[in-house]
């Protein structure tokens, strides 16, 4: 019996020595190489680490150094200087579920197709790590990341798991090519729902704070978002800049505050922007709300050729439409002011009062083409209940027929300027007058115009102007049909008899001042020459009592003989 006892003792000592030897051997480079090779050969993963460390002061912790881990045939998912694995009694029933995993000084490379990792942890901690996810939905890259996930149960394509609490900070981060620094993220994951209870970052030389939630269908609910002192330059057009907002199923905003922002793109810019938006939901190219509000002001706004100074907008949104409480801006050296309502039903914009004063505006070269284009889908009708203009300078630099109105004043009532997405003067009345004008190099003084319009005709009851010594007076009518049949009757007294030469009528065989009478008609159609449609008659008498009558048919004038109005003696 003593022999058997000694034998068992020797065997136990040998086992303890072997275990101790194996324990120390596994912590050598040889042990690390053999463990790495065994895992790589007997699983679908490749593993390599430089050394394994275990200390009796922390008996439940195993530390792997210089670790590389990933799926076979794919780039490494994890590269870390140190991986600290804390074990627990759970390993008896779930060997791959550990208590804590601490990753230090390394990089996690993630994609939407990342295969499920073969282990879990009650807590995943990151210390001075980096994230790279270039081909995922969010195109994420982050450096100096610290934080954790509780619990951590990774799934295929969901490296953080399907249900967990998250807390991260990052020294720098880039999300969809938008860089940020000093980032803080706190929240939770519940299957495909991501809740960010606390979000903060330094972005574009400013700050961003808020909280939001991303739902399973990809829609976002932003309860509160505040951006201050943003200074952002973008290479994208304004449409492309906001394209990501249209790519989500819907975006619900509880409160958005923008303070002192400066944004700039290739053909747009806004400086010193203050914006407050509340209770709005955007879906594709539409919006919904019960009680939405937008208040916005800026020092300067540029979009293409539109350049506004000190614009102020205050609006209220409802299911029925938009109440424009205030819009004011300095524009082209003057001031623009209006208020009104946009009605969703009928897509009608009704401006209660519109005032333009002090403008010095040159019309775009293609303004006639723009006038003939249809309006956007949201603007089926535009109505002005009241309109006023004061001391405006309007210039058209068309080389074929340049003109200018100086000190233009006017007023109008119940004007309909858009119907069925077409520009025009479809109803209402207007009166315009100016201190001076030039029409194709012909100077006149105090031109004035009075018109009324209905669904069938635009009637110009007064059209007059003073020349150097005389006066021109006319009446006209323009039909509302696509042909735009136009009739005009013009009388001139004490005017140059060839004053109409600059306006399209051939030179008369008369000289000097006199009286003229013109009746003409034609069709002012889009993309159709005017001259071939014009027919009319011109009668002129000069101060020498010479007279001539000419007739125009299809734009061609038949020459008339010059006769005398004096009786034959």
Swiss-Prot record:
<keyword id="KW-0997">Cell inner membrane</keyword>
<feature type="transmembrane region" description="Helical">
    <location>
        <begin position="7"/>
        <end position="27"/>
    </location>
</feature>
<keyword id="KW-1133">Transmembrane helix</keyword>
<dbReference type="Pfam" id="PF05170">
    <property type="entry name" value="AsmA"/>
</dbReference>
<protein>
    <recommendedName>
        <fullName>AsmA family protein YicH</fullName>
    </recommendedName>
</protein>
<feature type="topological domain" description="Periplasmic">
    <location>
        <begin position="28"/>
        <end position="569"/>
    </location>
</feature>
<keyword id="KW-0472">Membrane</keyword>
<feature type="topological domain" description="Cytoplasmic">
    <location>
        <begin position="1"/>
        <end position="6"/>
    </location>
</feature>
<keyword id="KW-0812">Transmembrane</keyword>
<keyword id="KW-1003">Cell membrane</keyword>
<comment type="similarity">
    <text>Belongs to the AsmA family.</text>
</comment>
<dbReference type="InterPro" id="IPR007844">
    <property type="entry name" value="AsmA"/>
</dbReference>
